[in-house]
Structures are given as C-alpha cells and as structure tokens.
Amino acid sequence: MIGWTHVCVSALILRKYGPEVLEEILRKAGYQEDIKFDIQCYYDDTETMRIFRVAATVLGLSVDDMWEMYGEFLITHACETGWQKMLFCMANNLQEFLDNLNSMHYFIDQIAFKSEMKGPTFQCEPFGESGLKLHYFSFRQGLFPIVKGLVRKTARTLFEMDVKVCMLERNQERRKSGMVEHVIFSVEPDDNHRKGKRLFHKFRNTKTTENAPSFTLSSTILVGLRDFKNIFPYHVCFNKQMIIEHIGIYLLREYGLENKKTLKVSDLMQLVQPSDIQLTYKNVLSYLNTLFIFQLKHHSKRNEVQEGSSEAFQQPLVLKGEMMPINDGNSIIFICSPHVTTVRDILNLKLYISDMPMHDATRDLVMLNQSRICQMELNKKLEETMKKMKKMTEELEVKKSQTDRLLFEFVPPVIAEALRAAKTVPAQEFSDCSVIFTDIPDFFTISVNCSPTEIITVVTDLFHRFDRIIEKHKGYKVLSLMDSYLIVGGVPNANQYHCEDSLNLALGLLFEAKQVVVPKLERSVRLRIGVHCGPVVAGIVSQQKPRFCVLGNTVNVTKSICSHSSPGKVLVSNAVRTMVTKHLKSIFVFNANGYLELQSGKVLTHFLEKNEKCSVWDIVDRDKATNDSIDGYRELHSDNGTEEWQEATVAAYRVISVVDALENKQSRTRKALTRLRSVKRKFRTIQSNDSGVSVSEPNVESAVCSIM
C-alpha cells in the first residue's frame, strides 16, 4: 500500500492514544521508534497488515474494528492534509459521492501518487424507498470494514447526516484478473433525510428523466454527425452488438477507419479499466458510474511514418472517459479524451495539444501537471537537502558533544562553559586549597616485567578507578602522566571541607590501587601519596588546546612529600593535620613522621592512618564482603606482598645490569660516578651565573613554582 496509509494510521494512534502507545505498536511491529513513513513510498501489504494486527492487539480491539476506526479517521486526516475542498466539491448528495468514488480513487492512485496499485471499485444503487445499496469489490481480502467507517464519517462530515451502514452479503467472485472480494452494504439515512423529508435530496439522487424539463427544439439547430465528430474527436459510439456506429474525427483519420464498414469495439481497442470485467454491453451498463480506460490495438499513421527508426514511438494511444447510454439504451457513447497527464506522455504518443479541443480539460491538466512536476522536483531536491542538513546537524551535534567531552576532560566544567561562550578566563589565586600527588614506587619493576600493552592495561584500570573516587569526593584531576597523578581540592570550586575530602580521597586511592593486580607478578599495585595545603594559582594555558594548570610552591612541597612517603602510605603535612582538626566533620588518626628537609625549608609530616567516622567501604562506595573487616582499614594497611615487591625490584635491577653489560653500555653505578666527577670539576671552577648557580648546572626544582 502507499505510505499515506501508514502515515494516516500513525496519526490516528498518536491522536487518540498518545506517543507512548504509538511507539509500543511500532516497536512490536518491527519498526524503530523514530521511523518516518514516506507518503510517496510503497509498502508491502504484509507490512500494513502487521501494523493493524499489532495495533488491534495493543489497543484491545478486533482487527475489523481497527480497520473501521481507520476508515472514519481517513476522512478526517484527508481534510486536514489539503483534500478538504476537493471532497466538499465532489457531489451534492451521498449517492453521487459514492458513484464518484471510483474516479476519485483512480485520480488519487494514478495521478496524485503515480501508483500502479489496484484499488477497490464501488457500485451504488437505490435500495428500498429511502436506502442505498453499495457494492464493494477488492482484490485485497478483509479490508471491507474500512467502507463502514468511511461512509459514516463522509455522511457526517460532508452532508451533516448520520447513516447506518450494515453488511448484507459477503462472497468471493472470479473475475478476469482473479478472485475478488464482493461485499454488499446497505446504507440507511436518519429520520431527517428519509424520503418525503426536506433533506432527502442530500442523501439520494432525486433527478429523473421524467421530471427533466423539455424544450421544443427546431430541427435546424440539431447537431449533425459530421459536426459531432469534430466536437468530440475521440468519441466511440456502439450498439448492443458492440459494433461501432460512428467515431471521432481524430480516430477516423489517424487510424484509417474511413472505409471500414463493420468494426467491433474489441477490434479497435482493449479494455484496461475496469480490469475485472468482460467487455460486454451488459457489463458496460452495470458500470456506468465507473471510469473507463481503453488502449488502442494499433498505432496511428504518425507513428508508422518513421517505423523502424530510432525515433519510432511504440506506445499506443490510451483513451479515458465515461460511458453514456443514448437512444433509449440501444446505444452507448464513449465520451473520452487521450489519457495523458504530462508533456512526456504527449511526446511519446506523437500527439499535440492542438489535437485536443479547447473545451477539453485535458489540455489544462497536462500543462498544470507539468508545472506540478517541476514543483515536485524542486520539493524533492528541497527534501533531500533538508535530509542532508538534518544529517549534518546530527553529525555536528555528535562532534560537538565529543569536543565538549574532551574540553570538560581537560578543564573544570565552570571554566569549560565560559570557554564555550567565548569568554576570557583569567587566572585565579586560591589562598586555601589542598593538593594530592600520587605515584607508583614500583613502576620501574612493573615496566621491566610487563609488556607495554600490559602496562597500559594496568594504568588504564587504575586511572578509571581513580576518576570515580575523585568525582565522589569533589576533587579535580589536574594531570595524569605515566604513573603520577595530581589532584586538587577546593579548586576551582571553593570547598570549606576540602582537606577532609582530600584525606578521604587519598584513603580511597590507596584502597582502589590494591584492587588492581599486575600481570606476571600477580601482586597488587602499591601507591605512595603526599598531601599538602596552601595557596596556588590556577588558570588556562593555551587557547587551541586549553589545559588547566596549577602553579605554586604548594605543588612543589606536595611532590616532595610524596617522594618521601612510603609505599602503601599517605604522608600529609602538618598544615593539613591542623586544618582538619579545626572541624568536627571527621576524626582522622595520624602517626608522626618527623620533619622533612625540603628546599623550601623543614616541613613537619604525619602518616594518615584512618578516618574514625567513616569506613573504607563508605569512602570507596563499595559493599563489604563476608570475610572483610568492619571498617576495612585492616585490608587497607595490610603489608602482604611487601617482601615480594622488594625481591622483584632487586631482580629487575639485576636484569637491567645484565642487559646493559650485554649491550656494552655503562652500568648505572658507572654513570653515577661519571656524573659525580663532572660535578666535582665544576665546583673547582670559579665560573657561575648571576644567581650563584654553576654554569651548565640544571636547576631541577624551583623553590617558587612548578607547572604541571
């Protein structure tokens, strides 16, 4: 069926039952939820039937009731999509409307939608004093309930009446094109539209030949046969024996019929529509309300002139029109026109617009339809352009989301939003924040024993776990490089309890690291962590590839504290310990470690043991196993594997020494001795720069700041 059917039933379900029900029906019918049916596309009948069966099941209706409801909504949807005026000007009463259903169906299928599909046919006749009998023929089985809903809604919408539609008979008939379903309906009007009532003419045709006005015409104004042939150049008149009595002037001349005395209709042309009947006089009388289409069996003289050449046209002429009984039913005249709708059709037949009478609407139809085709081509290009733009917009949104994700990965969300808005983000000084620095003391041992792929796998797993804990405890990852991790608290968003959150974060990092096992060594990863608090300066570096950087002596001190920490331990400065003791939010337990001699001076440090108000399981947001301790600190500070790591480290240095010897390289000891001799020679000289540092001596660590 045409896609208009799918669009219409989708609109029906959406309007009456809502988008959720429509999505459920489409999903169960095998379609994606965001599918858009194309009005001009043709869908297999099995797809259409499946949609209606699924819809009936979901809505709790029978399939016949679903088709009947669709028939009622069909008229509503047609009126809302631009067909309202055409429907209202179809007929003056319901009977005439039903009589013209066949021609309207043909127009919609063949001209509006350019479809070759076979639609149903209808016959309407009076039934009793006030009723109508409607015959429905269709090659598709089971669609007859549509007619009941359609007729009821048509009567109510177009003629303001209520009718009762009942099925009288249903059977199968064998026609020329195959088996068709024949259903007979009775249509009864309401009380205001019955015979004898003022509005009866709105229901049934009251025109009869008996009450038609008669005029006394002078014989001098009667139309002669020659004039009639010129007025209707394509007409064909035949008698009950199907023998042609006279024919239009165009057919007479172009097909060489002047000298033919006895010519049957079947010798000149073959019936195309209605396709399911035999061409007999009786059948023609039965289908007077149906559009007839004939195809001529021979080519005109125009086409035979160039027969055999590349320009020869082989398409025969097709005539379309209506049958009208004349001479008290003893003859039938076929008033018709060439069945052409576009300029291309005329060219293929070697016809010309001048071959059609000026009163023939086919001339206007061809020119209007040609204009419509041009408009449709423009609309088609516009639709394709819109689809491309929509696709490009979707791709742009995907790229934008990827860019935003990368931007939010490197800079805090607040700053990222400002950068997206093209605002300048100046550097800020934060007088109070905490800094965490972590590294893996056994990274050298891991790199010797594991392949590069295995190292990447371990680090990736580790950092994924870290990111989750950082987000939970309101920290911000400034940098992750090799085995090092720099995290800040209270930057860029101020946080009154940044020290407490940072210490909980440090405990969580230690625990998560223990959950990662190094391949080949089968040992848990050990971290060492340093925590310090103080002022920093933070800002964006680079415009094309923005990075969030933290500068200041606090960063240097934190790095130094981390380097003096022990594997599996968190070493914090006294400033951090003093800060957390001011608040009663958490109660942390520390062990003194003494003073560290750093370049910036002595720093008192402590080892962090635990948070007495919060268990490890709460910190890492994980469930406690059956055999685990209540607070989790036994597992956190377990020294299992320490000796194995020491043995593995010694073995790793031994391997490197052997490799260096085999490659004829200097050992690490020899390199250190060479370096010491070089330094000794430099100290013997009196050359120095203005700051007192020897020439060529690298300034490894600045006492002022460090850029991460």
Curated annotation (Swiss-Prot):
<dbReference type="InterPro" id="IPR018297">
    <property type="entry name" value="A/G_cyclase_CS"/>
</dbReference>
<keyword id="KW-0963">Cytoplasm</keyword>
<dbReference type="GO" id="GO:0008074">
    <property type="term" value="C:guanylate cyclase complex, soluble"/>
</dbReference>
<dbReference type="InterPro" id="IPR029787">
    <property type="entry name" value="Nucleotide_cyclase"/>
</dbReference>
<keyword id="KW-0175">Coiled coil</keyword>
<dbReference type="Pfam" id="PF07701">
    <property type="entry name" value="HNOBA"/>
</dbReference>
<dbReference type="Pfam" id="PF00211">
    <property type="entry name" value="Guanylate_cyc"/>
</dbReference>
<keyword id="KW-0456">Lyase</keyword>
<dbReference type="InterPro" id="IPR024096">
    <property type="entry name" value="NO_sig/Golgi_transp_ligand-bd"/>
</dbReference>
<keyword id="KW-0349">Heme</keyword>
<protein>
    <recommendedName>
        <fullName>Soluble guanylate cyclase gcy-37</fullName>
        <ecNumber>4.6.1.2</ecNumber>
    </recommendedName>
</protein>
<keyword id="KW-0460">Magnesium</keyword>
<feature type="domain" description="Guanylate cyclase">
    <location>
        <begin position="434"/>
        <end position="562"/>
    </location>
</feature>
<feature type="binding site">
    <location>
        <position position="483"/>
    </location>
    <ligand>
        <name>Mg(2+)</name>
    </ligand>
</feature>
<comment type="function">
    <text>Synthesizes cyclic GMP (cGMP) from GTP. May play a role in sensory neurons.</text>
</comment>
<keyword id="KW-0141">cGMP biosynthesis</keyword>
<comment type="subunit">
    <text>Heterodimer; with other soluble guanylate cyclases.</text>
</comment>
<dbReference type="InterPro" id="IPR042463">
    <property type="entry name" value="HNOB_dom_associated_sf"/>
</dbReference>
<dbReference type="Pfam" id="PF07700">
    <property type="entry name" value="HNOB"/>
</dbReference>
<dbReference type="GO" id="GO:0070482">
    <property type="term" value="P:response to oxygen levels"/>
</dbReference>
<keyword id="KW-0547">Nucleotide-binding</keyword>
<keyword id="KW-0408">Iron</keyword>
<dbReference type="GO" id="GO:0046872">
    <property type="term" value="F:metal ion binding"/>
</dbReference>
<dbReference type="GO" id="GO:0004383">
    <property type="term" value="F:guanylate cyclase activity"/>
</dbReference>
<feature type="coiled-coil region">
    <location>
        <begin position="368"/>
        <end position="409"/>
    </location>
</feature>
<feature type="binding site" description="proximal binding residue">
    <location>
        <position position="105"/>
    </location>
    <ligand>
        <name>heme</name>
    </ligand>
</feature>
<dbReference type="GO" id="GO:0019934">
    <property type="term" value="P:cGMP-mediated signaling"/>
</dbReference>
<dbReference type="InterPro" id="IPR001054">
    <property type="entry name" value="A/G_cyclase"/>
</dbReference>
<dbReference type="InterPro" id="IPR011645">
    <property type="entry name" value="HNOB_dom_associated"/>
</dbReference>
<dbReference type="GO" id="GO:0020037">
    <property type="term" value="F:heme binding"/>
</dbReference>
<comment type="similarity">
    <text>Belongs to the adenylyl cyclase class-4/guanylyl cyclase family.</text>
</comment>
<feature type="binding site">
    <location>
        <position position="439"/>
    </location>
    <ligand>
        <name>Mg(2+)</name>
    </ligand>
</feature>
<keyword id="KW-0479">Metal-binding</keyword>
<dbReference type="GO" id="GO:0005525">
    <property type="term" value="F:GTP binding"/>
</dbReference>
<keyword id="KW-0342">GTP-binding</keyword>
<dbReference type="InterPro" id="IPR038158">
    <property type="entry name" value="H-NOX_domain_sf"/>
</dbReference>
<dbReference type="InterPro" id="IPR011644">
    <property type="entry name" value="Heme_NO-bd"/>
</dbReference>
